């Protein structure tokens, strides 16, 4: 069980909830990192007194350094700071809750130190899954997923002695705020519309990804990497209630599912306490009041991002890094009101058509594909 954490992405939704859980469990916090939020990271640093605080933005880091003068907390900036936080000796678990491909190098740095990785940064496995999983095997690092769906699958597989027994993984999906709409109806949806998720409270980027179903597409790729399965054995299913977090179907026809309230603190707690379970102060799921549970097939005509993700997964190589980089760029444009909702999938498809795919890529190849895809999506 975890005793000390380094938290990458402390000011985001997952980061804030991780600190709540860490406080409940009595864990020590050795490092906190964020992008630009000086005020919140200062508040967190004063409360949890880590040895290291990192802001990716250099000007923000300078401001934080002045504010934390006299506290004994070291302040660093940029990727150098993220790498230092990920590799610090006293942290036995690194929680990677940063958004986007910026989490890739720090995750690899933590893996090379043989640490447990509580992985909430799906882009790491999407872009460089084979590199990451091979490195984890080489250095004896343990990867425990924090995404609710992958945590559910991870839990369902605990009694599985042979992955050959798995017939398929079923990742559940709420359908987002636009479930039931056609592609034409989605043409004029705004960022404000997309940010109204029916069940989960998340950051803006992942909420938009949930609205386009790209989030589920990325999770399909992540599951392929985590569990070493072909794309044909990973499937998305619409489950509006977000009670069943995912399912595993075995060769004998048995279907195991993990159920719980739509609360990210549950998978965060599990990732930090695995292989043990601890008492939670949160209200558990009441099956007698949760009502009917429904399941349906996703509409890939209305939500082409899911189809594009499956395509990239089948192509392999750097195609998934191209998919992810283009999507990050397109979602940023959408959130700033510069493009429409359906333009996100159009920009991603354009990048997949224009950027050459490299097979058996190095880390440098992956990062170059990410950069080229972002440019192609603009």
Predicted regions and their residues:
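Catalytic, metal-anchored helix/loop core of enzyme active sites in primary metabolism
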Residues: 1-378
